[in-house]
Swiss-Prot record:
GO CC terms of this entry: TIM23 mitochondrial import inner membrane translocase complex
Chief site of localization: mitochondrion
Organism: Dictyostelium discoideum
Family annotation (Gene3D superfamilies): DnaJ domain
Job description of the protein: Regulates ATP-dependent protein translocation into the mitochondrial matrix.
Membrane topology: Peripheral membrane protein
Top-level taxonomy: Eukaryota, Amoebozoa, Evosea, Eumycetozoa, Dictyostelia
UniProt protein name: Mitochondrial import inner membrane translocase subunit tim16
Gene designation: timm16
Subunit structure: Probable component of the PAM complex at least composed of a mitochondrial HSP70 protein, grepE, tim16 and tim14. Associates with the TIM23 complex.
Length: 113
């Protein structure tokens, strides 16, 4: 009787474990197909990045007045350097894109950056 109960518990636990692994694998595949890696999936689009941090990321902290052209030039330059196909980092590309969007938004709102 006890052996039967233990076998039932082990079988049920194993089934639950296998199903949870399958679901996690399916989610990982969906994220990979949509181009959202772990870093992209965990980043909130509306996460707050200060213009000061964004300037540092793009290497524009020593520039007195930042123009849209300055932002775009540094963005393209850094994105090319950090291309994952050439050994770059997808995480850094996400940070660079976030910095660009932050500074563009600040310029659009008329904030001094």
């Amino acid at each position: 009787m006890a052996a039967r109960l233990i076998a039932k518990i082990v079988f049920t636990s194993g089934t639950v474990l296998v199903r949870s692994i399958q679901m996690a694998y399916k989610q990982a595949l969906l994220q990979a197909e949509s181009g959202m890696g772990a870093a992209a999936g965990s980043m909130d689009v509306k996460s707050k990045m200060s213009p000061i941090e964004a300037r540092k990321i793009l290497g524009l902290e020593n520039v007195e007045t930042v123009s849209k052209e300055d932002i775009d030039k540094k963005y393209n330059e850094l994105l090319t350097i950090n291309d994952p196909k050439d050994g770059g980092s997808e995480y850094l590309q996400i940070k660079i894109s976030g910095a660009k969007h932050c500074l563009h938004s600040a310029l659009k709102e008329g904030k001094k950056i």
